[in-house]
Amino acid sequence: MQEKIRIKLKAFDHKVLDQSVKQIVDTVKRGGGLVKGPIPLPTRRRVWCVHRSPHKFEQSREHFEMRIHKRLIEIENATPQTIEALMDISLPAGVEVEIKLS
């Protein structure tokens, strides 16, 4: 039975996220694994509306936005050496990694 490894990456900055994805894909390809992806998942966008003044001027508001970018990588035919190489990768700060085996 073949195992699939799904790696889901999340970050606020899409450039840092894409660099991390490229680093993971290169490592897996060097180890001889088969890579599907990176698959861009929907970006989550959160918007907050805040009053500029603490007491009055209801019409004066300011909007703040936060975007969470996501990517999915599927790895098939991963060897133990590939998994060991993935464990040794140091990713930049601000990138959240979620790994699932199926």
Curated annotation (Swiss-Prot):
Involved in the binding of tRNA to the ribosomes. Part of the 30S ribosomal subunit. Pfam families: Ribosomal_S10. One of its GO terms (molecular function) is tRNA binding. It comes from Sulfurihydrogenibium sp. (strain YO3AOP1). It comes from the Bacteria. Belongs to the universal ribosomal protein uS10 family. GO terms for cellular component: ribonucleoprotein complex; ribosome. SUPFAM superfamilies: Ribosomal protein S10 (SSF54999). The gene is rpsJ. SMART domains: Ribosomal_S10 (SM01403). GO terms for biological process: translation. The keyword Transferase does not apply. Keywords: Ribonucleoprotein, Ribosomal protein. This is Small ribosomal subunit protein uS10.
